[in-house]
UniProtKB/Swiss-Prot annotation:
Organism: Lonomia obliqua
The keyword Nucleotide-binding is annotated on this UniProt entry: no
Residues spanning the signal sequence: 1-16
TM segment ranges: none
Keywords from the named record: Cuticle, Signal
A single MF term (Gene Ontology): structural constituent of chitin-based larval cuticle
Stored Pfam families: Chitin_bind_4 (PF00379)
Protein name: Cuticle protein 3
């Protein structure tokens, strides 16, 4: 009888263990912590809206908002060949610095401006000279459409240009031997 009770208890424990069913896998790419210096989103609550104005009419729209955590924005827009709008927004970054962006959005796209945006490097001098030369050629009526013109690449024509422009003098005394 004792063996029967032990066997029944063992079967009961085994049957009551893990029940078959779906268990969602843990997302392995989500970090459990955020290293220092990285942005950590504020998950403790939402900021209260201090001001929210909105006006929409057939002529266009206008809105403005401000929240208690320092986020603010405003925009106006009119319908003329699509929607043309301009506005600005500002917020405090994770580093404590105030960031402000003004923008224009129209047929030319979205064009933001801000003091914190990176500035492009200066144009190299060779490119500036090339652009100036292209402008001079265009003003003189010289256009290069990019297609091949045999006369333009004729060796006699190239030599004549070189002599005229650069005082090119061909070397007739020395010709290196070609070894194949």
């Amino acid at each position: 009888m004792m063996k029967l009770i032990v066997l029944a208890a063992f079967i009961g424990v085994c049957a009551g263990g893990a029940l078959p069913g779906y268990v969602a896998p843990q997302y392995r790419f989500a970090p459990d912590y955020y290293p220092e210096g990285r942005y950590r989103p504020n998950v403790e609550g939402n900021a209260a809206v201090l001001r929210s104005d909105s006006e929409v009419s057939e002529q266009g729209f206008r809105y403005a908002y401000e929240t208690e955590n320092g986020i603010r924005g405003e925009a106006t827009g009119v319908e003329s060949d699509g929607i043309q709008s301009q506005g600005s927004f500002a917020y405090t970054g994770a580093d404590g610095q105030q960031y402000s962006v003004t923008y224009t959005a129209d047929g030319n796209g979205f064009q933001p401006q801000g003091a914190h945006f990176p500035t492009p490097p200066p144009v190299p001098e060779a490119i500036v000279r090339s652009l100036q030369e292209n402008a001079r050629d265009e003003a003189a009526g010289i256009f290069d459409d990019g297609s091949y013109h045999e006369a333009k690449y004729d060796p006699a024509s190239i030599a004549a240009k070189a002599q005229h422009q650069y005082h090119y003098q061909p070397n007739t005394r020395y010709f290196p031997r070609y070894h194949y």
